[in-house]
Amino acid sequence: MRALLARLLLCVLVVSDSKGSNELHQVPSNCDCLNGGTCVSNKYFSNIHWCNCPKKFGGQHCEIDKSKTCYEGNGHFYRGKASTDTMGRPCLPWNSATVLQQTYHAHRSDALQLGLGKHNYCRNPDNRRRPWCYVQVGLKLLVQECMVHDCADGKKPSSPPEELKFQCGQKTLRPRFKIIGGEFTTIENQPWFAAIYRRHRGGSVTYVCGGSLISPCWVISATHCFIDYPKKEDYIVYLGRSRLNSNTQGEMKFEVENLILHKDYSADTLAHHNDIALLKIRSKEGRCAQPSRTIQTICLPSMYNDPQFGTSCEITGFGKENSTDYLYPEQLKMTVVKLISHRECQQPHYYGSEVTTKMLCAADPQWKTDSCQGDSGGPLVCSLQGRMTLTGIVSWGRGCALKDKPGVYTRVSHFLPWIRSHTKEENGLAL
């Protein structure tokens, strides 16, 4: 009750002082005032201190720049008053009960330095691409970029951007064809990558394989990932996910409505034949995938049209770095390999006749990096006629990054009739 009375009294004093009262006194007490603000008190209540801010600043500590209408750089030091996302939805206050359960909120010890407080203004405390905020959409709490423009652009956004559309093979980051040894990456680098998990009876979920989004409702993967557990109800699919066991901003979760395994799939001692599968995905709300910066389709090649041997291509997944590793890495990883000719891959010291014309071989020329256990079903993506194209599906190989033992991939260009016959939506495919 005393605290409430003190606050009410403080409000009265502040209003009085703003109307011309000369009862304010600067005090040496530390109010953590920023931007030239001074710590003051009223002579009648000297134990109550607050920040007296310069004209263009506001907030408890003068931390809000009321004149700032754009952000510089990535907006890490933006302290303006933008408070809606790019769709015009209001941001949640950083001190709201929902936000207090997240990583960044007003009660952090470094909240003042990060610009967080008892307000809902957009900030960028973790050095993302631009200022963002938390937005409540139904029962979901989303991290959304804000409706505030870059000072370098010289203009304000007059309205929310047009609805995004799927454009196969397009990503926000440029292709990286000079990686040696692989590197950890984010989903923006491979926005078509799908992470496939299997449910267990006890309720736990484990990662199974990768896949690629070829149309809003269809993910392509490898049959050998599902052959032992072919029930569609056993699987869930995530798009837009950068980490194996934790959520990523903007990710989408899907049930598997239909699981199609190639009827002519077979496995020898080492090789997998016709190793291709299709998963029709649907969210609990009945929707297919929605395009975003982190979710995009990959282009399919034209019939029997593959890049030249020696072409550098990207592979992505949560696979192990070595076949002896016990755990999968937590962060998505990407590496670059080069396509190897069939003639070379069919040499006896490679794989001999186990490699067929429905397969492709690819490896790091130094044999330092490769697809490995856990990468199965994931994409081998090459630039073809200016578009990132799904050239192969991770299938099999001996060990990981062993000399003369390249990774072997399902040759997607040889399976287009099969893909079309089962999806029955050729116009929706990323051709």
UniProtKB/Swiss-Prot annotation:
Record-annotated site: Cleavage: 177-178
Enzyme Commission identifier(s): 3.4.21.73
Stretches assigned to the Kringle domain: 70-151
Keywords of this entry: Blood coagulation, Disulfide bond, EGF-like domain, Fibrinolysis, Glycoprotein, Hemostasis, Hydrolase, Kringle, Pharmaceutical, Phosphoprotein, Plasminogen activation, Protease, Secreted, Serine protease, Signal, Zymogen
Localization in the cell: Secreted
EGF-like domain: residues covered: 27-63
Tissue expression from the record: Expressed in the prostate gland and prostate cancers.
CDD domains named among the record's database cross-references: KR, Tryp_SPc
Span of domain Peptidase S1: 179-424
Region (Connecting peptide): 152-177
Signal peptide residue numbers: 1-20
Effect after changing residue 158 to E: Abolishes phosphorylation, proadhesive function and ability to induce chemotactic response
SUBUNIT field: Found in high and low molecular mass forms. Each consists of two chains, A and B. The high molecular mass form contains a long chain A which is cleaved to yield a short chain A. Forms heterodimer with SERPINA5. Binds LRP1B; binding is followed by internalization and degradation. Interacts with MRC2. Interacts with PLAUR. In complex with SERPINE1, interacts with PLAUR/uPAR. Interacts with SORL1 and LRP1, either alone or in complex with SERPINE1; these interactions are abolished in the presence of LRPAP1/RAP. The ternary complex composed of PLAUR-PLAU-PAI1 also interacts with SORLA.
Designated name of the protein: Urokinase-type plasminogen activator
Provenance organism: Homo sapiens
